[in-house]
Swiss-Prot record:
Alphabetical list of PANTHER family matching this protein: V-TYPE ATP SYNTHASE SUBUNIT D (PTHR11671)
InterPro entries, alphabetized: V_ATPase_D (IPR002699)
Organism: Streptococcus pneumoniae (strain CGSP14)
Family in the record: Belongs to the V-ATPase D subunit family.
Annotated HAMAP family: ATP_synth_D_arch (MF_00271)
Molecular function per GO: ATP binding; proton-transporting ATP synthase activity, rotational mechanism; proton-transporting ATPase activity, rotational mechanism
Superkingdom of the source species: Bacteria
Gene Ontology terms describing biological process: proton motive force-driven plasma membrane ATP synthesis
Keyword terms, alphabetized: ATP synthesis, Hydrogen ion transport, Ion transport, Transport
A Pfam family reported for this protein in Swiss-Prot or TrEMBL: ATP-synt_D
Coiled coil: none
Family annotation (Gene3D superfamilies): 1.10.287.3240
Name this polypeptide is given: V-type ATP synthase subunit D
Length: 203
């Protein structure tokens, strides 16, 4: 603890007591914020882990399926299947405030880009059709995964900042204020006793 460099006066004592009350209120609010952020963060981490495992599993299986599907077609035909994008994806990113943390909210609009796309169920095979269907179903999960991962990163940063502020109040500001208040109270009591002794001597 470090005693603040202030004059031991009653006015200063009152000011320090007000500062201590404010610091203690701020400490409680920040602790509550930190705890709620942690609760939400843990929930998001669980969702993130679940989504990541799910997406990775789908991608691994899909790559295997694609290798099989590709082996059943000649290379030129496979190139033709992928030569023109069949869909256009517009990505929209909005902002949402969660406990003073600005996090992204993503959604998309998918439209057919070319009705006469090279990809055709006639020129393809059932294996390749399954690959396309799986990849299309994965888009929403990939978007949600990106959203959750970014939110986790931003919330982790805010938790760390809040933790530092809580610790600063708990281990530095509040103890220093308390120590200084105690010191001033002792000094004022000493002054009162000294004054009382002088009065008694005069009498």
């Amino acid at each position: 603890m470090v005693r603040l460099n202030v004059k031991p006066t009653r006015m200063e004592l009152n000011n320090l007591k007000e500062r201590l009350k404010t610091a203690e209120r701020g400490h409680k609010l920040l602790k509550d914020k930190r705890d709620e952020l942690m609760r939400r963060f843990i929930s998001l981490i669980r969702e993130n882990n679940r989504l990541r495992k799910e997406v990775e599993s789908y991608l691994i299986d899909n790559l295997k399926s694609f290798a099989v599907a590709k082996s059943l077609k000649n290379s030129l035909m496979v190139e033709e299947l992928f030569s023109i994008p069949s869909k256009e994806i517009e990505l929209f990113i909005e902002k949402e405030n969660i406990m003073s943390v600005t996090v992204p909210r993503m959604h998309m609009n998918i439209t057919s880009q070319n009705e006469n796309s090279e990809y055709s169920y006639l020129s393809s095979n059932s294996e390749m059709d399954d690959v396309f269907a799986t990849m299309n179903s994965l888009i929403d999960k990939l978007l949600r995964l990106a959203e959750v991962e970014k939110t986790c990163q931003l919330m982790a940063d805010e938790i760390e900042k809040t933790r530092r502020r809580v610790n600063g109040l708990e281990y530095s500001i509040i103890p220093n204020l308390s120590e200084t208040i105690h010191y001033i109270e002792l000094k004022l009591e000493e002054a009162e006793r000294a004054n009382l002794v002088r009065i008694m001597k005069v009498k």
